[in-house]
Amino acid sequence: MSYKQHYQHFLKQHPETLHCSPHSHHYWPDVTRAAQLAYWDDSAKGVDHKWDMIFGERLPRVQKLLAELLDHPAPEQFVFASNTHELLYRVISCFDPAQPLRILTSDGEFHSFSRQVRRLEERANVEVVRVSCEPYATFAERWQQALQQQSFDLIFCSQVFFNSGVVAPWVGTWLAWVPESTQVVIDGYHGCGALPTSLHDVADRIFYVAGAYKYMQAGEGCCFMSVPKGTALRPEYTGWFADFANLAKPQQTHVEYANDGMRFAGATMDFTALYRLEAVLQWWREDGITVAAIHQYVQQLQSDFLAVIDELEHPLLNRAALLVDDLAEHGHFLTFELPSAAEVAALAKQLQRGGVETDYRGKRLRFGFALYHDASDYQRLKKALS
């Protein structure tokens, strides 16, 4: 089965390209184009009253669709922002900066978190414990040891590590070791929409952060976070959306917050991407496209891709260079580690000249897979690497 008919607008712009970087910027399906225009039309109709439509109709619909996708029992606990950093920093701003802050994380987190935490470490009262991702085979054991060695105020870990594609131990397997007073944030950006994910058993205990840019296929500008129900946390970094329902009432000296996920909301943003995300999720629902089906399709593509790699017998790009050769516990991109960053850059440029788009970081070359690929597409690698 091919899904290419759903991505014609993007594919027609790149007829001679094999786009192997959907893990960076995923092609948008055709349904998102009408959604983009729908936001414009709603703005024209509603003008200043469009917020009533967005908060009263559009946003609740997307909350319900996300709750279905992630098996979350409380749709109202999803909050939206333009980027994950904004949501992450709202959680961090709940901690008193005058008090010590102890953070547990890995050394494989994306820049939104890793850069911010390095900056926080410049404070004398912030301590960060980083568990090395490698060797990946023992990460789960070492992570659990770190959890048991001391208590933390904040724990942050990816669902899938961005620089390898390796699936991290699911939070449900180690949450029992975490005290109730510790806040837990899971970065689901490389898991949401790619790996079957159920938040049902952890929804009231963790923050789950993800966005539409990658496997949710709706582009930049719409990130979201599930917030534990009943949390009393009060983000210092807050905006007028965080108590939207009470804006017309007299403002009190004491800052009030919504009693659902919106307590972590910010302020005015462009909701065009929310419309696109709704279109994608509605398309999946109507066509019966589940994340499990997407994952199975991509796993088969990865096997087909590796079969071509084996045929090539390339001196650098081969199965031995795979960072981890385990498709069962892997995200939707494969990572090859070469001897040097210079060789990676040169190989990426050669592939690009041959019509194969990849991306790379240092010594690691990444190939991503998507619904708009067919197994036959990977034959292009032979020409690109000849």
Residue positions per predicted region:
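Pyridoxal 5′-phosphate
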Residues: 1-386
